[in-house]
Amino acid sequence: MNFLAHLHLAHLADSSLSGNLLADFVRGNPTQAYPTDVVDGIFMHRRIDVLTDNLPEVKEAKEWFRPETRRVAPITLDVMWDHFLSRHWAQLSPEMPLPEFVRYAHSQVAMILPDSPPRFVNLNEYLWSERWLERYREMDFIQRVLNGMASRRPRLDALRDSWQDLDTHYDALESRFWQFYPRMMVQAKNKQL
């Protein structure tokens, strides 16, 4: 899962949106550095990552990547799941339109920015102003996201080429998303994540 799905599942679980978004920027045990609700959100994010990576549907999808891009498949898939969530938001979360959810999420996350790591603050400058969460629905934007990550981290250069795998297996990936994501939504609502 990437930013949008983590925020969405956190919202469904009444968990800290801030902690769930911050988690990738926090190493080790966060309990001394953040309030309890943010810490709980960080741990929820970590559980979701482990759960998602071990889902049969996700394991199967990783195998569809070519040998030269399989190493980055987990990252590419995380971004792609956000694409499908953004694209089908109205169907999956009809009670709150995506732009309204994004405004709400931004207001929640903004509260912790003064005490956040610089890399997280930097991400937030672009995430909200450039409307990433809403633009995930556009495949051109997904390609831009993958290229941007590859540019910032040369060891992840294969992300650029992983675009072809997404394009080739788009329909099958969308089908797998529909198999597991609604299930995760139920787990979130039942506080099982």
Swiss-Prot record:
Keywords from the UniProt entry: Fatty acid biosynthesis, Fatty acid metabolism, Hydrolase, Lipid biosynthesis, Lipid metabolism
Biological process according to GO: fatty acid biosynthetic process
Documented EC number(s): 3.1.4.14
GO molecular function (one): [acyl-carrier-protein] phosphodiesterase activity
One Pfam family from the record: ACP_PD
Catalysed reactions listed for this entry: holo-[ACP] + H2O = apo-[ACP] + (R)-4'-phosphopantetheine + H(+)
Top EC group: hydrolase
TM stretches of this protein: none
Family: Belongs to the AcpH family.
PANTHER family, per the entry: ACYL CARRIER PROTEIN PHOSPHODIESTERASE
NCBIfam families: PRK10045.1
Function: Converts holo-ACP to apo-ACP by hydrolytic cleavage of the phosphopantetheine prosthetic group from ACP.
Protein's UniProt name: Acyl carrier protein phosphodiesterase
Organism: Enterobacter sp. (strain 638)
Name of the gene: acpH
